[in-house]
Amino acid sequence: MYRKVILAMVGAGLASFNALYCTQALLPVLSEDLHVTPATASLTVSATTGMLALSIIPASIISERFGRKRVIMLSALSATLLGLLPLSMSVGMLITLRGLQGIAVAGVPATAMAYLSEEIHPKHVPQVMGLYVAGTSVGGLSGRVIPSGVLEFASWRWALAATVAVAIIFAFITSWALPDQQRFQPKRLTFRSEFSAIAQHVKNPRLSALFTLAFLFMGAFVSLYDYVGYRLTGHFGLSEGVAGAIFFLYLSGTWSATQAGTMIHKFGQARVLVGSIVGMMIGMAVLFSPELISSILGILLFTACFFAAHSVVSGWVGVVATTNRAEASSMYFFCYYMGSSIVGWLSGHVLHSWEWGGLVVWLLAGLAIATMIALFIARTTPSTRSTPSPARDSR
């Protein structure tokens, strides 16, 4: 029934999230080739996610005025056509182009959920939304695995070129397949009214707690995957291409995110959230081990639990926010990607100063704070045993 919509949205997720993380697997090589520290190399990821975070709310406002389809198509195409990355002659130019990609990518996560909520029958929204999320997951995976694989026989510039080529294909599929909107009603929104709605959400202590969790979760997740390559190539002596295979553990998150809904039905949101954070901490603690197999198992557990926690928290935002839910969702993703940008960059300095053990302690400290926040939310927010539907703007 919704084949073209599904094809288009999966393509948008693949194209945009492929572009978003295409340098993450290359950080050790960038450090060596461009003679920069891990923290500086990580700016090729942090600049992208930071600019994405700053652009999500403006992109959402623009989509309310000019339509979701236009924003999604422009976002997917421009993010991939900014594929001048392989031509970058300096780290400064590379970081600048990556920041521009972040602005371009923002249109997809800012509007995709709203498009599906408006155009898909409510009965089918969860299934179609799940396929879109799967597309973003596989897109993020391909953006990491493709360049790391190409590194086995070519330079990082060719690795990025290969990633961009794949993203362009999916961007044009999105442009061809995405149907015209039938139920969209333009709204004359202003930045002032939108930020006023967001300010009301920030003043809500339960929503602020959920936003903070998004910041801490994503910060820890991206930090781990930003710098685990240095551990795998340095301590364990793996090649860059083999080390890139660690990103296949990302697929455990595709499974755990879908299982989170089942677990919520059985145990409630609070228990699933706290259990997921504890699992993340156990997985992180295992990374103190000097053994490769133990480290892989730790990353596997951490990744699966991260996606479960993200699924719970993002759904809970729509429950706690009884009005202006679109703005609450935008604020959630703003904090989510700012965590990636800020914590990811700071973690590079921690790694440079205190090496791997210091990085693990730093990330565990953030997860300990997240545990306390989760316990606060569990005490102050009713925990339902139903999976919330995607949030709609209830104004």
List where the protein language model places each region.
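Juxtamembrane intracellular "pre-TM" segments in multi-pass secondary transporters
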Residues: 179-210
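Cytoplasmic helix-loop-helix junction between adjacent transmembrane helices
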Residues: 97-136
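Helix-loop-helix hairpin linking two adjacent transmembrane segments in secondary transporters
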Residues: 122, 131-179
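C-terminal transmembrane helical hairpin of 12-TM major facilitator-type secondary transporters
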Residues: 270-313
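Paired small-residue
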Residues: 92-101, 293-301
